[in-house]
Amino acid sequence: EKFNCIRPREYDGSHIQFFGMNPEIALRPHQRNAIAHILYGHNTLLAHVVGAGKTYEMVAAAMEKKRLGLCSKTLVAVPNHLTGQFASEALKLYPNANILVTTQRDFEKTNRKRFCAKIATGNYDIVVIGHSQFEKIPLSDTCSTGTSILMPMQSYTRITAQ
């Protein structure tokens, strides 16, 4: 007989306390669970429908990871037209957060290196950047060729094919 013996892990975020979050905003249970998944699962796809609260999930998870010392700052790449909206929602959820929002001018050729240095050295909680701007940040040879991503996937394919 065949049966499904793989069950996805379920995350419970009901115990998580969010220090510094706007007390007038209450996260819904599915948002708390998604944040727990981000904190404990290390890789997470937020595939909720529009309006389900993905922005709050990302912001709260980023702030909690920083508070716990799991990261020093989070860079969030969003569609270009959503950078301002994302930052606005982030500040609504965490009014005291130090958020850097990129503009088109920041990534003009003459300003790009200086701005990347500002991202690297600044004490920001979250950096919000547009997709087209993110593509202009130079990557190491390993990252740009996809070698670090491709190798584990090849070994995974070999293991499952046997």
Name each model feature, range by range.
Residues 47-49, 77:
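Residues at the beta-strand->loop junction immediately N-terminal to the Walker
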Residues 2-47:
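Pre-Walker A segment
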Residues 13-26, 42, 54-162:
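SF2 helicase/translocase NTPase motor core
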